[in-house]
UniProtKB/Swiss-Prot annotation:
It comes from Mus musculus. The modification N6-acetyllysine is found at residue 603. Part of the nuclear pore complex (NPC). Interacts directly with NUP96. Part of the Nup160 subcomplex in the nuclear pore which is composed of NUP160, NUP133, NUP107 and NUP96; this complex plays a role in RNA export and in tethering NUP98 and NUP153 to the nucleus. Interacts with RAE1. Does not interact with TPR. Interacts directly with NUP88 and NUP214, subunits of the cytoplasmic filaments of the NPC. Interacts (via N-terminus) with DHX9 (via DRBM, OB-fold and RGG domains); this interaction occurs in a RNA-dependent manner and stimulates DHX9-mediated ATPase activity. One of its GO terms (cellular component) is nuclear membrane. Residues 512-535, 663-682, 886-937 are annotated as: Disordered. Residues 738-880 form the Peptidase S59 domain. GO terms for molecular function: promoter-specific chromatin binding; serine-type peptidase activity; structural constituent of nuclear pore; transcription coactivator activity. Its main location: nucleus. This is Nuclear pore complex protein Nup98-Nup96.
């Protein structure tokens, strides 16, 4: 390979790595300058140079040779091994004559002269690299000349062959204050000088590699193999690769050198590098420095006699594969036939001729087979197959061989083991590379490099690459082929092995069960007991210093995670197979309870931390999670470090709440231990005590999930961060220093708003934690002196406020108030991949939002929303403790949320008089037995504390007396409903239904059924437990405790105790009046062990109770005679306080239920309207109203009238504008859903205006109609037709149009102000005519003002008023007059009313008087008259409306030019009430009149429309969209279309809803038909039809349907479909099918008919009814769209037709053709009747009737076809039909057993008859 051409890409016509090749001469990498190792870089110039030394002239080599070669007759190859060179200087200053690296008698490492690696010390005779004695001292200090120290590696022992002898020494010991010198012994083998350079692990590794696990043979003199498996020989010479040595480099005990020669240098004869015998004295590469030989040549030419590149015979490949005789290069390749061709062609890298790199069938390593890399072969894909593929492929990658050897020579002729040794095979990784490199391995499971796989052992003592060691029975890369066990020269190896074997036998003797913790130390060796107790014993020291599994704890075992020995994916290292490792044969989890008593947890032992690919330090080093971390169970229970020193006075109240067992109480931490507790384990809880402690810590919700356990994000961690970080003191005393927490407002803002008293009261306070969630407190919150670090804890999927209930303030104070909680990152976990499910679609599929809503409801919170994008769960709470998501909620992914009850298995009662067994608590103290507790009570109390599903938000203990009432034995069991109903005189069944409808949740239906379905038997105890959300105080009572309390029970209580699956015998217990024994320490006391829970004490003797029956009270006792008289003020007794009062029950549709006096005017509900309203109420179906007059407790159902009943006139206000709108609209039917658009133009404006003008007088008196009139007349003035311009033929100019619009607008202003002006004039005409004159002026009634001034004698004022409409000069003169009066201060003598008129005439809205007063012309005027003043008097007569509007806007707004002096344009319903715009500061924009908005739109075409169409600008009712919608449609007709789509949708939907509420749903559809989006339009119309289409046919309904279909063009199919939905809701299958057919839903109609109607029709023989449906569905254009028509509907139809045909045949004589046709039909039915689907028993009955009848029809038809001759008088007999014609068809009919037997009887008779006839 290195001596031939390898292709041209790198060097033109030369080879890749050989002569004149890539790294040699004239190539791309080496031109005239030298190669890497033979160039002038080391001191001389050369002509050519190769990387590894081609022919050089006089180079100076690196180690003293001339580039490792000299000019010779032989061609030099890579590394220059084997050529002689001239004199040169070495790198280290020595001179050498003709040396090469490995073949000179004076080479670099074995020369007699001082060389670079040898002149550091003494000198000896000769030297070699790996152990020859040379003239130079070893650089590493040894007296031998080996590079690595000891000569031939014989000085250093391998493993522990030398017996342990503890070195002695002295030390000082202080005892009782006196120092004493003592003698010491180092009880460690590495303290011995023989092993001081190695660690324990290295010694163990060497022992394992030497297979020193059992008896060892005597070593040192045995026959051993060479370095790579060569046969041993004896020699005394040493050398690097060719000298003989007794124990050379790696082949202990052989007489060969490292690479096969026995002389110094490379020219002698003995064995080669890999154990081959050479034929004669050869060099390293089998060539004596330029001499050609003919000897076998291996891959590296090791041990052969060929020259480097000379022809040789029987050369071998790289790894010892014999190949044909051909010119051999370095790797056995032919050197004569190569040409510089493409990369990879010619001869391969390892000696095989190729066709080219990448060509079909060729590979990089010289494969000449026509297969590609990876083709299937006959051998397994592994090293050591019978072929030479790199990964086991048979024909490919032979790596220079063409024989049956593997890729690297591993494992010749194996059966094929895999690359990682998974399959045992003989001869794994076999012989190769000169019969080394893994030769002749024994059978067994092979590892990567061929060694047998021992079982996993200790961490030491393994060989490289997984081999057990050198010179063992297996090989590692060929190191140590089958040899006798070698332990260097230790003669005691055999004895040591015998001792090891004896130890194994002893371990089996004294540990018969293995090393399981369960049976650990059941027996002990008495001989070694004393030895083990000595402190100097290594086992004792190890037990003292090593953390072990086997601690003395109340658990089966603590789960300390050992450090993983490896990080690979394999289960264990194969070096340690067969060893007695520390992993117990019985796993730790074998005798441990699972994580939860409810769940089956299969622990995957292969995935434990020991073998996990990734080692977590927190898991490796952590102590067991269930034991207190550093003496602490839960970190948030510990106190700060400075408080832990006060152990004597420490208050254990908080700790004792969680730990009743003193063993489990937390140990006070030291400052050192606090910092090291963060990395805590999150291992699975699987011990009894851990389970109990975990259950004891439940206060509503357990620790959320393992990811959010108390260990990883503990509250104490947050406190430590607070203590470690200094913070400034907040002025309000607020503390918040935990990392990640924030507040809104921020802490700095809170400091700013703190008042002088140091109080901080903030509104809408929010505290959150980044990435976890937040809490929003609405309203004012007092944060003074709140330590938020201790109070608020937001963690993953849960939030805790006030951990300690003792420190929690009352509800409403502090942070214990209503709040909105947002928890982020709340996603479920996929049980398969353990990844979070974040896909919204998948979350919707598993109904995760519904699950969160159920969890919220279960916790007493109000669910708001769930955002799957961020995993945000938002809910509201009324007060605080702990909320969140628990494990059991997460585990409900795959199961429906149906409550399943748990069956209690209790121990049988002991016999009477038997002593009660004392129960032991965890701390070992005997607990007094409960007094006569029943097993249900005992178990129920325990399960409450243990069950993970129990939610206790209130954290209140269970009342003592909650389980103590009993049912009298002699009394028949009566349900609670019967008790209540009997006392009230109500039907118990009705009360039961009402109660279920009122109080049950949807998810509690199943639990309710279970609860009420179980009636306590006679003598059976009924116990209850209060719901955690509704703590009910249960008191003693001699009466039976009614089961109605179950309505308030939790699902757990109902599902557990009242289990329908529990037998009556199991639930039957003696009566008891004792109270449950609840530990007084806390509600979370540790329960008793599970084994003692079922220990039932003997019942106590009871006193027989007297049975008293129920006595019904005939009527209500008068209050004076009642025992409650005068006690109604006793607040502490809720039964007496307000005892005669009653609550009011609100029902739907404003229905009021009360037992007091009836309200006035609401008697109609007592009669007929109750039944009508039952569809909203408690009962499922309308029922007849039963009078309750026989009971003194009358319940009145009354409907409150919040407003007066709508009159027909009121509906006209809705219908008339809509009719006008429909008149001016166009219906487009281009699509399925019609679209209505307004007609362009202003005609609809005039119609609206005319309608309000012509309305009756009482109509116009309505405020809403008045405002409508103003609006429509204003629209008419602004956009309507101008009568003055209608007669003109030409288009008027813009000036004329503006002037006419001004006049029309002026008329509108005058008209709107007229009523107010008349009222003011009538009031002031006599007393103050000047004010009346001003009122006339505000309405532009100048003539009336002049007349009034003259009448009052004010002629000069009348003269001025007459000039008001004159030129501007009049205003200027009046202004001069006012200025003169002001200068002379004469205005103080003129009345203000007159000055106001003068200022108005002068055009001054505000005039300043001399007495520091001012006259405001616009004061006390509404906005329309103010605007009129600006238009008429303050602006020129030619000014436009827009200019007047702009001036008015400046008047009511504060502008830099001046202050405001006019009122704002408030809506008409706000005018005169004193409301100003300033009161609307909170809104985004001020509230203004719709008329003002219309004027703004007229002035600015792009004015915002949503302000104009807001209902509040029109009426005080914000939901009245009547005028708003009509205005929008008018503006659309005027081409104002810039309203946003959202606002338009709100407008249309709101108006449609308003019409729907008034009963005008058909007009609501008209409104919906204006929606532009066709999809939304169709959806809205269909939903509206579904809500309001009724099944009853009335003239009113017909009129509405005709209006929809004829005027609005709504498809009639939509109406029919809506009726079908209504019929389905009312369970009217007939009408549903009828309307489905009319709606065109053929398939649904067919399915409904077949499933619900066909069977009844067949059974009742109502064939015409069924035929009507089926014949309508039968046409091909319909039946082709129906699924299963051929096997369902058509079968019924053919059956009916056959019956009709038979009736016709029976009545009229028929022809033979008709009989044949009928026969065909009948026989076809016989085959198809069985295909009819049957859903219930009724369907099967109908099918059976059809089969029976078809059988009869078949007999009749066959009898008619085979009738006797006409000459005979006999009639056809169906019983005499030939059997051959009848039997095949009868057998196919699906008849029940009785029908089938009857038919069989008939067929048998026919058969016998035929036999009889045939025999005759």
């Amino acid at each position: 390979m290195f001596n031939k051409s390898f292709g041209t890409p790198f060097g033109g016509s030369t080879g890749g790595f050989g002569t004149t090749s890539t790294f040699g001469q004239n190539t791309g990498f080496g031109t005239t300058s030298g190669g890497a190792f033979g160039t002038s870089a080391f001191g001389s110039s050369n002509n050519t140079g190769g990387l590894f030394g081609n022919s050089q002239t006089k180079p100076g080599g690196l180690f003293g040779t001339s580039s490792f070669s000299q000019p010779a007759t032989s061609t030099s190859t890579g590394f220059g091994f084997g050529t002689s060179t001239g004199t040169s200087n070495s790198l280290f200053g020595t001179a050498s004559t003709g040396t090469s690296l490995f073949s000179s008698q004076n080479n670099a490492f074995a020369q007699n002269k001082p060389t670079g690696f040898g002149n550091f010390g003494t000198s000896t005779s000769s030297g070699g690299l790996f152990g020859t004695t040379n003239t130079t001292s070893n650089p590493f200090g040894s007296t031998s000349g080996s590079l690595f120290g000891p000569s031939s590696f014989t000085a250093a022992p391998t493993g522990t062959t030398i017996k342990f002898n503890p070195p002695t020494g002295t030390d000082t010991m202080v005892k009782a204050g006196v120092s004493t010198n003592i003698s010491t012994k180092h009880q460690c083998i590495t303290a011995m000088k023989e092993y001081e350079s190695k660690s324990l692990e290295e010694l163990r590794l060497e022992d394992y590699q030497a297979n020193r696990k059992g008896p060892q043979n005597q070593v040192g003199g045995g026959t051993t193999a060479g370095l790579f498996g060569s046969s041993p020989a004896t020699s005394s010479a040493t050398g690097l690769f060719s000298s003989s040595t007794t124990n050379s480099a790696f082949s202990y005990g052989q007489n060969k050198t490292a690479f096969g020669t026995s002389t110094t240098g490379f020219g002698t004869n003995p064995g080669g590098l890999f154990g081959q015998q050479n034929q004669q004295t050869t060099s390293l590469f089998s060539k004596p420095f330029g001499q050609a030989t003919t000897t076998p040549n291996t891959g590296f030419s090791f041990g052969n006699t060929s020259t480097l590149g000379q022809p040789s015979t029987n050369t071998m490949g790289l790894f010892g594969v014999t190949q044909a005789s051909q010119p051999g290069g370095l790797f056995g390749t032919a050197t004569n036939t190569s040409t510089g061709t493409a990369f990879g062609t010619g001869t391969g890298l390892f000696g095989q001729p190729n066709t080219g790199f990448g060509a079909v069938g060729s590979t990089l390593f010289g494969n000449n087979k026509l297969t590609t890399f990876g083709t299937s072969t006959t051998s397994a894909p592994s090293f050591g197959t019978t072929s030479g593929g790199l990964f086991g492929n048979k024909p490919t990658l032979t790596l220079g061989t063409n024989t049956n050897t593997s890729n690297f020579g591993f494992g010749t002729n194996n059966s094929g083991s895999s690359i990682f040794g998974s399959k045992p095979a003989a001869g794994t990784l076999g012989t190769g590379l000169g019969t080394g490199f893994g030769t002749a391995l024994g059978a067994g499971q092979a590892s990567l490099f061929g060694n047998n796989q021992p079982k996993i052992g200790g961490p030491l003592g393994t060989g490289a690459f997984g081999a057990p060691g050198f010179n063992t029975s297996t090989a590692i890369l060929g190191f140590g082929a089958p040899q006798a066990p070698v332990a260097l020269t230790d003669p005691n190896a055999s004895a040591a092995q015998q001792a090891v074997l004896q130890q194994h036998l002893n371990s089996l003797t004294y540990s018969p069960f293995g090393d399981s913790p369960l049976f650990r130390n059941p027996m002990s060796d008495p001989k070694k007991k004393e030895e083990r107790l000595k402190p100097t014993n290594p086992a004792a020291q190890k037990a003292l210093t090593t953390p072990t599994h086997y601690k003395l704890t109340p658990r089966p075992a603590t789960r300390v995670r050992p450090k993983a020995l490896q990080t690979t994916g394999t289960a264990k290292s194969h070096l340690f197979d067969g060893l007695d490792d520390d992993e117990p044969s019985l796993a730790n989890g074998a005798f441990m309870p699972k994580k939860s008593i409810k769940k089956l947890v299969l622990k995957n032992l292969n995935n434990s931390n020991l073998f996990s690919p990734v080692n977590h330090d927190s898991e490796d080093l952590a102590s067991p999670s269930e034991y207190p971390e550093n003496g602490e169970r839960f970190s948030f229970l510990s106190k700060p470090v400075d408080e832990n020193n006060q152990q004597d006075g420490e208050d254990d109240s908080l700790v004792s709440r969680f730990y009743t067992n003193p063993i489990a109480k937390p140990i006070p931490q030291t400052p050192e231990s606090v910092g090291n507790k963060n990395n805590s384990s999150s291992n699975v809880e699987d011990t009894i005590v851990a389970l109990n402690m975990r259950a004891a810590l439940r206060n509503g919700l357990e620790g959320s999930s393992e990811e959010t356990s108390f260990h990883d994000e503990s509250l104490q961690d947050d406190r430590e961060e607070i203590e470690n970080n200094a913070y400034h003191i907040h002025p309000a005393g607020i503390v918040l220093t935990k990392v990640g927490y924030y507040t809104i407002p921020s802490m700095d803002d809170l400091a700013k708003i703190t008042n002088e008293k140091g109080e901080c009261i903030v509104s809408d306070f929010t505290i959150g934690r980044k990435g976890y969630g937040s809490i929003y407190f609405e309203g004012d919150v007092n944060l003074t002196n709140l330590n938020l670090d201790d109070i608020v804890h937001i963690r993953r999927k849960e939030v805790i406020v006030y951990v300690d209930d003792n420190q929690k303030p009352p509800v409403g104070e502090g942070l214990n108030r209503k709040a909105e909680v947002t928890l982020d990152g709340v996603w479920p976990t996929d049980k398969t991949s353990r990844c979070l499910i974040k896909s919204p679609d998948r979350l919707a599929d598993i109904n995760y939002e519904g699950r969160l809503e159920a969890v919220s409801r279960k916790q007493g919170a109000q669910f708001k929303e769930y955002r799957p994008e961020t995993g945000s769960w938002v809910f509201k709470v009324s007060h605080f403790s702990k909320y969140g998501l628990q494990d059991s909620d997460e585990e409900e992914e795959e199961h429906p949320p149906k409550t399943t009850s748990k069956k209690l298995k209790t121990a049988p009662l002991p016999p009477a008089g038997q002593a009660t067994t004392f129960q032991m608590t965890l701390n070992g103290k005997p607990a007094p037995p409960p007094q006569s507790q029943s097993p249900e009570v005992e178990q129920l109390g325990r399960v409450v504390e243990l069950d993970s599903d129990m939610v206790d938000i209130t954290q209140e203990p269970v009342p003592d007396s909650v389980l103590e009432e009993s049912v009298p034995e002699d009394q028949e069991p009566v349900s609670a409903s019967t008790h209540i109903a009997s006392s009230l005189g109500i039907n118990p069944h009705v009360l039961q239904i009402m109660k279920a409808s009122l109080l049950v949740d949807e998810e509690d239906v199943d639990a309710m059924d279970q609860r009420f379905g179980h009636i306590p038997s006679k003598g059976e105890t009924v116990q209850e437990i209060c719901s955690p959300r509704l703590p009910i105080s249960a008191s003693h009572s001699s009466k039976s405790r009614s089961i109605v309390g179950g309505l308030l029970q939790s699902k757990f209580a109902s599902g557990t105790f009242l289990s329908p699956s529990a037998s009556v015998q199991e639930c039957r217990t003696p009566r008891t009046s004792s109270r449950m024994n609840i530990p007084s320490t806390s509600p979370w006391s540790v329960p008793l062990p599970l084994a003692t829970v079922f220990t039932v004490p003997s019942p106590a003797p009871e006193v027989q109770l007297k049975t008293v029956g129920i006595r019904r009270q005939p009527g209500l006792v008068p209050l004076e005679k009642s025992i409650t008289y005068g006690k109604g003020k006793l607040l502490m007794d809720m039964a007496l306080f307000m005892g005669r009062s009653f609550r009011v029950g609100w029902g739907p549709n404003w229905t009021l239920a009360n037992s007091g006096e009836q309200l006035h005017g609401s008697h109609e509900l007592e009669n007929h309207q109750v039944a009508d309203s039952m569809e909203y109420g408690f009962l499922p179906n309308p029922v007849a109203v039963k009078s309750l007059s026989e009971s003194p407790f009358k319940v009145h159902l009354e409907k409150l009238g919040l407003r007066q009943r709508k009159l027909d006139e009121d509906l006209q206000l809705y219908q008339t504008p809509l009719e006008l709108k429909l008149k001016h609209s166009t219906v487009h039917v281009d699509e399925l859903c019609p679209l209505i658009v307004p007609n362009p133009g202003v005609s609809v404006i005039h119609d609206y205006a005319d309608w309000v003008k012509d309305s009756p007088g009482d109509f116009l008196e309505l405020p809403i109609v008045k405002h409508w009139s103003l609006t429509w007349t204003l629209c008419e003035a602004l956009w309507g037709h101008l009568k003055e311009l209608d007669g003109q033929l030409d288009e008027p100019s813009e000036y004329i149009q503006t002037l006419e619009r001004r006049r029309a607008f002026s008329r509108w202003l005058s008209h709107t102000a007229a009523p107010q002006i008349e009222e003011e004039v009538s009031l002031t005409r006599r007393d103050s005519p000047v004010e009346a004159v001003f009122s006339y002026l505000t309405g532009s009634r100048i003539s009336g003002a002049c007349c009034l001034a003259q009448q009052s004698g004010d002629h000069r004022l009348a003269l001025l008023l007459s000039q008001l409409v004159g030129s501007q000069s009049v205003r200027e003169l009046l202004t001069m007059q006012l200025a003169d009066w002001h200068q002379l201060q004469a205005d103080s003598f003129i009345h203000d009313e007159r000055l106001r008129i003068f200022a108005l005439l002068a055009g001054k809205p505000v005039w300043q008087l001399s007495e520091q007063k001012q006259i405001n012309v616009c004061s006390q005027l509404d906005w329309k008259r103010t605007l009129a003043i600006h238009l008429w008097y303050l602006l020129p007569p030619t000014a436009s409306i827009s200019r007047a509007l702009s001036m008015y806007e400046e008047a009511f707004q504060n502008t830099p030019e001046g202050d405001k002096y006019a009122c704002s344009p408030l809506p008409s319903y706000l005018e005169g009430c004193g409301c100003m715009v300033e009161e609307e500061k909170d809104s985004r924009r001020p509230l203004q009149d719709v008329c003002f908005h219309l004027l703004k739109l007229y002035s600015d075409r792009h004015y915002e429309l949503n302000q104009l169409l807001e209902p509040r600008s029109i009426t005080a009712d914000p939901l009245d969209y009547r005028l708003s919608w009509h205005l929008w449609e008018v503006l659309r007709a005027l081409n104002y279309t810039h309203l946003s789509e959202q606002c338009e949708g709100v407008l249309q939907a709101s108006y449609a809803g308003q019409l729907e509420s008034e009963g005008l749903w058909e007009w609501a559809i008209f409104v919906f038909l204006h929606i532009d989006n066709s999809g939304m339009r169709e959806k809205a119309v269909r939903e509206l039809l579904t809500r309001h289409c009724q099944l009853s046919e009335t003239p009113e309904s017909w009129a509405k349907e005709a209006f929809l279909t004829q005027k609005l063009c709504v498809p009639a199919e939509w109406i029919h479909e809506a009726k079908a939905v209504r019929a389905h809701m009312e369970s009217n299958k007939h009408l549903e099918a009828l309307y489905l057919f009319k709606a065109g839903h053929w398939n649904r109609c067919h399915k409904l008919v077949i499933r619900h109607l066909a069977s009844d029709a067949i059974i009742n023989e109502n064939y015409d009814y069924l035929k009507g449906f089926l014949e309508d569905l039968a046409p091909p254009e319909r039946s082709s769209l129906i699924q299963d028509w051929e096997t369902s509907g058509l079968v019924y139809l053919d059956y009916i037709r056959v019956i009709e045909m038979l009736h016709r045949i029976q009545q009229v004589d028929c022809s033979g053709y008709e009989l044949e046709h009928l026969h065909t039909k009948v026989t076809s039915l016989c085959n198809r009747i069985e295909q009819i689907p049957c859903y219930n028993a009724k369907d099967r009955l109908a099918q059976s009737d059809m089969a029976k009848r078809v059988a009869n029809l078949l007999r009749v038809v066959l009898s008619l076809q085979h009738a006797p001759d006409a000459t005979s008088n006999s009639t056809p007999d169906p019983q005499r039909v030939p059997l051959r014609l009848l039997a095949p068809h009868i057998g196919r009919l699906p008849m029940p057993e009785d029908y089938a037997l009857e038919e069989l009887r008939g067929l048998t008779q026919s058969y016998l008859r035929e036999l009889t006839v045939g025999s005759q």
